[in-house]
A protein has these predicted regions:
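Bacterial N-terminal signal peptides that target proteins for export
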Residues: 2-15
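C-terminal motif of bacterial Sec signal peptides marking the signal peptidase cleavage site
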Residues: 24-25
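A short beta-strand-turn-helix
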Residues: 36-56
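Short pre-active-site segment immediately N-terminal to redox-active cysteine/selenocysteine motifs
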Residues: 55, 62-65, 96
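Conserved redox-active cysteine motifs that mediate thiol-disulfide chemistry
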Residues: 61-75
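Structural microenvironment flanking redox-active thiols in thiol-disulfide oxidoreductases
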Residues: 74-111, 125-129
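Short, internal strand/loop/helix patches
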Residues: 107-141
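Thiol-/selenol-based redox modules, centered on thioredoxin-like
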Residues: 141-174
């Protein structure tokens, strides 16, 4: 994990070609290609607004340069695997488009991330955060949103596995 926390400015051998392959084959059944989805902020807002009926949906907003984000990613991966029948986790990368094929890909490989990763093309609009949750008042990460039926839990801080477990139980009993 220490290697993942360092600065991700160097280009990994073949990283651009590998990432280009992932993005170009997103329509295939290839699991690696299906892991990455690009979208703009309007699409993100629409997807987050959809009410999950059968599983708790967990959105973890992160970036490759955010040390607290990188530290919590393994906790989220373990949580999602332990609760695969009841939880759907999505990692939402807020990295700039220019580092998707370098820094983001390197973090994904280094931390062995297996859950879906949404790459958000934010442009210059930062007001979209308030549409995700009114509690998102600062442009800070990590941020996590958990939704289930009509219930939501919003966290503007790094989370530990224990906190994820507690939030899951709380949402399921509402």
């Amino acid at each position: 994990m220490e290697a993942a926390i360092k600065t991700y400015s160097r280009l990994r051998t073949g990283g651009i070609l590998f990432f280009a392959f992932l993005l170009s084959s997103c329509g295939s059944s290839n699991k690696a290609a299906d892991q990455f989805i690009t979208m703009d902020t309007d699409t993100l807002i629409e997807k987050v607004a959809q009410v999950p009926a059968s599983k708790v949906k967990v959105y973890n907003f992160w970036a490759s340069w955010c040390t607290p984000c990188l530290k919590e990613i393994p906790e989220f991966e373990a949580f999602a695997k332990a609760h695969a029948a009841e939880v759907e986790l999505v990692f939402v990368s807020l990295d700039r488009k220019k580092v998707w094929d370098t820094a983001v890909l390197e973090v994904v490989e280094e931390l062995e991330m297996t859950q879906p990763i949404w790459l958000i093309d934010q442009g210059l609009d930062f007001e979209w955060r308030h549409k995700i949750d009114e509690g998102w008042v600062l442009p800070a990460i990590p941020v996590t949103l958990m939704t289930y039926k009509s219930h939501r839990k919003f966290f503007m801080k790094p989370l530990e596995r224990r906190e994820l477990e507690e939030a899951l139980l709380e949402l399921q009993t509402l």
